[in-house]
């Protein structure tokens, strides 16, 4: 049985709840257990995952990054998006861990809600499927 850590950014609560619902529904239908931790925003996701990867007290087979960044009127959106993607990529590349990237980047809250809703785009569920696939691949290639 695979054990997965879900790191959920709660900055946009409604979107966070939808992402988490999609992900946990998918994981409940698999042979995986999971724990959920919350972080304040998307930028904090890579650090939280790295904390868990480096922890001597926890051992996860894979990680799920859930969150949302919505474009505003300043460059902040671009910096946050680039920082999150770069941070997650560095965690994966430097620690060889399976990770599903479910951080929505959208031009509006309405577009983000469509992507998060499990009855529509279901990014949370898709990301859970991706991490399960990567855990299987990792175990086959080790």
UniProtKB/Swiss-Prot annotation:
The active site is at residue 76. Pathway: Cofactor biosynthesis; riboflavin biosynthesis; riboflavin from 2-hydroxy-3-oxobutyl phosphate and 5-amino-6-(D-ribitylamino)uracil: step 1/2. It comes from the Bacteria. Its EC number is 2.5.1.78. 5-amino-6-(D-ribitylamino)uracil binds at residues 11, 42-44, 68-70, 101. SUPFAM superfamilies: Lumazine synthase. InterPro entries: LS, LS/RS, LS/RS_sf. Belongs to the DMRL synthase family. (2S)-2-hydroxy-3-oxobutyl phosphate binds at residues 73-74, 115. The keyword Transferase applies. Keywords: Riboflavin biosynthesis, Transferase. Catalyzes the formation of 6,7-dimethyl-8-ribityllumazine by condensation of 5-amino-6-(D-ribitylamino)uracil with 3,4-dihydroxy-2-butanone 4-phosphate. This is the penultimate step in the biosynthesis of riboflavin. The lineage of its organism: Bacteria, Pseudomonadati, Pseudomonadota, Alphaproteobacteria, Rickettsiales. It is an enzyme of class 2 (transferase). One of its GO terms (biological process) is riboflavin biosynthetic process. GO terms for molecular function: 6,7-dimethyl-8-ribityllumazine synthase activity. It catalyses: (2S)-2-hydroxy-3-oxobutyl phosphate + 5-amino-6-(D-ribitylamino)uracil = 6,7-dimethyl-8-(1-D-ribityl)lumazine + phosphate + 2 H2O + H(+). This is 6,7-dimethyl-8-ribityllumazine synthase. GO terms for cellular component: cytosol; riboflavin synthase complex.
